[in-house]
Amino acid sequence: ATPAEMRGSFAGAMGHTQFMPSTYQRHAQDFDGTGHANIWGDDPTDALASTAQLLKAEGWRKGQPWAVEVTLPREFDLALTGRIFPRKTRDWQRLGVTTASSGKLADHGNGALILPAGPEGPVFMVYNNFHVIKKYNYADSYAIGVGHLSDRLAGRGKIRSGFPQNPWGMSTRERQALQQRLNDRGFAAGNPDGVIGEKGRAAIRAYEQSRGFPVTGLPSKALLASLG
């Protein structure tokens, strides 16, 4: 690549699959045999091969799905959700978790439940490969988008449940206020940006536990009101 071709984003990511320079040094591949690992040119072969190498190095498991959309039984304890709480497949089966089509949950290894759009949206059982994608980009939305696109390219179906426009039934300002009030109380909820991620949910769990509330880890208007 010429200096003029080596363009990147404001953060320094470059090439077809947006590699940081240090990532390029570790994982770039000359897959087409030209003698150069060119992730910038019109032919994306090297960029895709380099990305595959990165995912492999991060622990990608061939043949394992990134996630499976599932259905939870009524009165399911939402405190069991969150990607930091993986369980064995047989344990989820005992708790009544099924696939979204009401089928038996297959054993793809330990999995964790996530509710990216709140209790009214889709529920996913995520596996090791989901976490590998997040090492490439930490946003759940990114990992879900990439994972679902790969499913569709492989001929698999759409996500069955819809994504509500207003997850958790709270406005952005209300979610920001929730994060800020948790921070003010000493429960580290992270930057009050209105995006409730794993750090925010961990803070909610800790706060709920301290108050003797049912531990869900989920944001709500009632939780915000309890913080004053």
Give the ranges of each region predicted by the language model.
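Catalytic glycan-binding domains that act on GlcNAc-containing polysaccharides
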Residues: A1-H108, G121-F124, V132-S150, G155-R160, ...
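Surface-exposed charge patches
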Residues: S22, Q53, R90, A177-Q180, ...
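Short glycine/proline-rich, acidic loop/turn segments that cap or connect secondary-structure elements
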Residues: G109-F124, T172-L182
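Short acidic, glycine/serine/threonine-rich helix-capping segments at coil-helix boundaries
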Residues: M170-R175, N183-L227
